[in-house]
Amino acid sequence: DPSIRGREVPKETTGPRNLPTPALVLNVYSRVSSTNQKVDPEPNHLAREMDRFNRTRTGLDHLWLTERDTRLLDPRQRKVGERWHAPLYLARRIARFHLVDNVRGEPDHYGQKDVAKAQLELEVLSRNEGVVEIQIEGSFRMTKSGPYPTRFDGRLDGRLVYNTQSRKWIRFDLLAQGISTGRGRYTPGAPDGTFELTVAFEIPPDDFAVKIPPQGMRHRDQYLTP
């Protein structure tokens, strides 16, 4: 509904989801990759156990790309060395709903006004017998205030491979890394102070992920047009 774009979607407009059929699904993994937190050396100390949990557990979600999304990324008419920007709404979808710390539970997603920067740029690296290799890079910065303030600031890099004959993406590897702070309402136990957060994206090895909507899809309109 165009009337709700540009502001938060009221709760009564968030369901049922009326899910679209995704053209491409990516697995999304999150991991607390480094912390500066000092913990008690006592093995049974709760902080020590939580620190171990943060360092060894991985959050999982799924990024859905629609037919429109993949069409705007289509490199078939692009030349080697050509650069272009991914649509802003797609960069914002990734920033708001997927660049989050969901290692310990369901995260609070960033709001529309929380995204200070979200941009992605692509470049064709090579074309060989119908296979196009693409580099993607970008940057992001989100800050959420309120009772559970969080922040994530960093860069995203990756490699994409597209088969022009089958018209399918055969590789879609992205890696976002940056500095994060804070915890969500349902993600207690985040490291104190700042910590490094890593979020990785890839095409799943099977079709199981296709059946599982992204957590952010509970806010369908915001997810598709953030």
Which sequence ranges carry the predicted segments?
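Acidic, serine/threonine-rich low-complexity disordered tracts
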Residues: 6-226
